[in-house]
Amino acid sequence: MLNEADSLALLAARGIPVVPYRLCRSRAEAVAAFEQIGGPVVVKGCSADIAHKSELGLVKLGVNTREEAGEVWAQMEGIIRKHGARFDGVIIAAMAAGRREIMIGAHRDPVFGPVVAVGDGGKYVEIFRDTALLLPPFSKAEAMDALGSLRIAPLFAGVRGEPPMDVDSLCDAAVRIGELMLDPAAGVMSLDLNPVLLDSAGKGCVVVDAVIFRE
């Protein structure tokens, strides 16, 4: 498993929008990252040995000062080392905005090969299971059709006077994930991007959290 910083870097290299972040290996770097990104920020422990960070207290939202960023960095390091996991650093990331949490996942099926899933995201993704499957390579039009099959699809057009959401950017990200899964040099076995924050038309989407497994 890649750590989250490496996962985000891999996605960004493929043209997939990710939240602005810095990987900090010292308290001083965490303070500098806070000043560079600007508060409030999210602080997350980073370890290739830990996939679900929130369950261990390795995610802190709304950090508002440089002093707090340094303090939380030290706390995250302590938690990771306490659990005997590899300490890869601490991520300082911008507090991304969006109107809907979306999930993009992918895996290698023994029969069909690479499969990409898109659907409603967030912490209840496994409860509501509102997803559609795509077999790469697929086009943006095919991704659009898949999103249109979701139960949440009416929300994309905007309801109760809300503007439409930027589904075009989401389709572009899905297509790029399909291309990534088809690239043997990348060696990606599976990935889970949740949430991908989808904003209003023209404002794009952004990957906030990523878990990627490679060969």
Q: What is each residue range found by the language model?
A:
Residues M1-E215:
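ATP-dependent carboxylate/acyl-activation modules
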